[in-house]
């Protein structure tokens, strides 16, 4: 027997729980910092951890549409914006770690790094796209952009690909591809589902 559709009230109860869950990694950093648990290199730990949680939140965001269709719960789409904004939040912290700790707030050094290191180039491109989606995630932006809003926000899949490539190139230099392969496989499944759904709709329209 299919589950009853989630109501607006139920989604309203889920949102605070999702918000708290989204902040847990951030809170954990403070707890680790207060208890000398940020490893021997806290800067590297926080940079890597913020990047990992950016990718996790991004994949959760991409999973909302398949999940709502597979479960018959269209109201789940109301959680997608929060997941996407958490991806941008952790992505901003990851970007800030690079700007502040790695490049010392030096614009010239940042531009050189973007131009010389491919994994930085694709990571920077992913962040710029994420910033554009975060800035246009409001109801006002949806009304203002109209049909162009949906086209713009499909760039989330490009962001996913760029993020995986960024992670892959970074880990490839250390011959450690286990995590990039895991996250890349999840992204491939989500993209495959999306393509299959598009193909079915196209066939039904003929």
Curated annotation (Swiss-Prot):
Principal subcellular localisation of the protein: membrane
TM segment ranges: 14-34, 45-65, 82-102, 118-138, 149-169, 179-199
Key word Ribosomal protein present: no
Matching Pfam families: Ferric_reduct
GO molecular function annotations of the record: electron transfer activity; FMN binding; heme binding; metal ion binding; oxidoreductase activity, acting on diphenols and related substances as donors
Taxonomy, superkingdom: Bacteria
Matching PANTHER family: PROTEIN-METHIONINE-SULFOXIDE REDUCTASE HEME-BINDING SUBUNIT MSRQ
Family: Belongs to the MsrQ family.
Name by which UniProt lists this protein: Protein-methionine-sulfoxide reductase heme-binding subunit MsrQ
Protein's organism: Bordetella parapertussis (strain 12822 / ATCC BAA-587 / NCTC 13253)
Gene coding for it: msrQ
